[in-house]
Amino acid sequence: MDTELLKTFLEVSRTRHFGRAAESLYLTQSAVSFRIRQLENQLGANLFTRHRNNIRLTPAGERLLPYAETLMSTWQLAKKEVAHSLQHTELSIGATASLWEAYLTPWLQQLYKQRETLRLEARIALRQSLVKQLHERQLDLLITTEPPKMDELASLLLGHFSLRLFSSIPFELPEKTDDGTEHKNANEAPYIKLEWGADFHQQESRLLNSEQMPVLTTTSAHLTRQLLDTTGGCAFLPEHWQKEYPELVVNADIPPIVRPLYAVWLQNSDQQTLIRQLLKTPMNNAAQSAIRD
């Protein structure tokens, strides 16, 4: 349905006069009458009764009125949102919560310091959801530890980052019992499972060698850090956080897990130039690979 017809209907119902409605809409009176007839033909019902200068809504017109108001309000909101997106969003970037919190937020801060007019949309979601958005052209750039294997996607290795097993209290060394067996292994501490990718969980299981269920499973690195003291647990967190959060205690017996960091976008994306320009800005605390033009 043509929204201009609904707009004309609402103006006539408000003014109860075709001439005044025409003035408000900057139309001729005949154009207003023609639009109303078009709308009536589409609906198969008369919307106004006309007795000289006395114009009233018919029962059909009364029923249409609230729907017309809602439709026009929704249409105006839709136009506003589309215009806002065109004016204020240059590029949409997606990543998991843990990557945003640990590495990408400082990178974003650097980008805005370098480009005052930069307009971005930062999305936080699970990797599977972001890959789908990228494939459907709803997302411009994906930052992930595992690039999707799709022919239409281009990927670039940005570098690597290191994760260490942290707790908020010192890890206890294994103690020996009278028969010589060890107990109180550090791996027996409550464990918080943080999402760092499917490949990570394989390394995680191999290093911890523990079958205990995690006390918490989450995608948020900051939530994990804040709950270490409460739970008395441990978790794999960014190695550089040891300097930022002195309360974190590293388990020196567990080696670091090194993860790759990739940028992924559509090969035929019209944002490729901007994407490559932004990726030249180093991601602090993640070793950088060379990014060429």
UniProtKB/Swiss-Prot annotation:
Entry keyword annotation includes Repressor: yes
InterPro entries in the cross-refs: LTTR (IPR050176), LysR_subst-bd (IPR005119), Tscrpt_reg_HTH_HdfR (IPR020890), Tscrpt_reg_HTH_LysR (IPR000847), WH-like_DNA-bd_sf (IPR036388), WH_DNA-bd_sf (IPR036390)
HTH lysR-type domain boundaries: 1-58
GO process annotations (BP): negative regulation of DNA-templated transcription
Keyword Repressor: yes
Domain of life: Bacteria
UniProt DNA-binding region: 18-37
Keyword annotations: DNA-binding, Repressor, Transcription, Transcription regulation
Molecular function per GO: DNA binding; DNA-binding transcription factor activity
Family affiliation: Belongs to the LysR transcriptional regulatory family.
Job of this protein: Negatively regulates the transcription of the flagellar master operon flhDC by binding to the upstream region of the operon.
NCBIfam families in the cross-refs: PRK03601.1
Protein name: HTH-type transcriptional regulator HdfR
Record organism: Yersinia enterocolitica serotype O:8 / biotype 1B (strain NCTC 13174 / 8081)
Gene name, Swiss-Prot/TrEMBL: hdfR
